[in-house]
């Protein structure tokens, strides 16, 4: 028995560990360190309809126990991803989760329709933290009705299951999750980064050219745990948890909160081997904790040992 295998909508994972979108590119740099086939899945960089250069520099700043980024969705566009990146990734035995971004519902729909047809794309991850240019620039992920509308539109055209990446920059993340569930999403990924800022004490100006950026890393882990704990009890969708994971113990904590798999982001910048190392360490930790299978850990903090999510 593979004690780490996880079944989710569209995803048969050999283990529940995957790199988070935006921290792993399309895997080319990390493939120099290890065989990407060891990963449970891989979330590729956000893809838009046209190529995007991203925000001006500086767009990364270190913070205590984390980092700020304002990359601005730099990517080569869906045509290039389909022609170059996904065919290159096909050499690895790893299911791909394609992160889809856009400025309008129509852009999301077009990207989703095209990228979901790629043979090694097993699921989509909707990045709903993008600003909606037709709604005054407000992020798709901050208004439940807007997020639900986007989810429904993408579900209608996608050939694969759709996971929605929840933004923590909301007053009621449970209401957001419920609206997305009712709109037909197949799963949730959470949490995205929190909006933050650093100011240079010598100049008195924000360090990031964009002013604000997304805070990630261990600093946001307690927030991610709390939000997953709340959402997992309110909806029936499987959750891929993320936010500051850097050890096997962190993975178990996310599972206890209610996650069924996890994604690792910022830690890849610190240690490129973090994903395979955690995969290797998990069986011994399960032994220590007295579990036969990783799925037994899901929702352990609130479910009295009952199965929370099992199977696709």
UniProtKB/Swiss-Prot annotation:
Pfam families: DHO_dh. Its EC number is 1.3.1.14. GO terms for biological process: 'de novo' pyrimidine nucleobase biosynthetic process; 'de novo' UMP biosynthetic process. Substrate binds at residues 45, 69-73, 127, 192-193. Disulfide bonds: none annotated. Binds 1 FMN per subunit. GO terms for cellular component: cytoplasm. Its cofactor is FMN. Pathway: Pyrimidine metabolism; UMP biosynthesis via de novo pathway; orotate from (S)-dihydroorotate (NAD(+) route): step 1/1. Heterotetramer of 2 PyrK and 2 PyrD type B subunits. Belongs to the dihydroorotate dehydrogenase family. Type 1 subfamily. This is Dihydroorotate dehydrogenase B (NAD(+)), catalytic subunit. It comes from Anoxybacillus flavithermus (strain DSM 21510 / WK1). The lineage of its organism: Bacteria, Bacillati, Bacillota, Bacilli, Bacillales.
């Amino acid at each position: 028995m593979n004690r780490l295998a996880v079944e989710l909508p569209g995803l048969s994972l050999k283990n529940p560990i995957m790199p988070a979108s935006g921290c792993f590119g399309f895997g080319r740099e990390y493939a120099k360190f290890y065989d990407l086939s060891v990963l449970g899945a891989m979330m590729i960089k956000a893809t838009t309809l046209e190529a995007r250069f991203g925000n001006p520099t500086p767009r990364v700043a270190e913070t205590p126990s984390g980092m700020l980024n304002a990359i601005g969705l730099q990517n080569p566009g869906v045509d290039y991803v389909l022609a170059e990146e996904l065919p290159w990734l096909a050499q690895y035995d790893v299911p791909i989760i394609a992160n889809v971004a856009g400025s309008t519902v129509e852009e999301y729909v077009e990207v989703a329709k095209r990228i979901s047809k790629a043979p090694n794309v097993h699921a989509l991850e909707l990045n709903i933290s993008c600003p909606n240019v037709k709604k005054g620039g407000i992020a798709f992920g901050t208004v439940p009705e807007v997020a639900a509308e986007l989810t429904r539109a993408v579900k209608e055209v996608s050939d694969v299951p759709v996971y929605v990446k929840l933004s923590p920059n909301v007053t009621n993340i449970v209401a957001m999750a419920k609206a997305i569930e009712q709109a037909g999403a197949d799963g949730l990924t959470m949490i995205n980064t929190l909006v933050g800022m650093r100011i240079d004490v010598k100049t008195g100006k924000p360090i990031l050219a964009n002013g604000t950026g997304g805070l990630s890393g261990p600093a946001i882990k307690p927030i991610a745990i709390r939000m997953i704990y709340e959402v997992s009890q309110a909806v029936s969708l499987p959750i891929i948890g993320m936010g500051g994971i850097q050890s096997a113990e962190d993975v178990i904590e996310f599972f206890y909160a209610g996650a069924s798999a996890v994604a690792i982001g910022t830690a890849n910048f610190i240690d490129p081997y973090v994903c395979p190392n955690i995969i290797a360490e998990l069986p011994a930790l399960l032994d220590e904790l007295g579990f036969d299978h990783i799925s037994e850990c899901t929702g352990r903090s609130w479910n009295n040992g009952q199965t929370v999510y099992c199977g696709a």
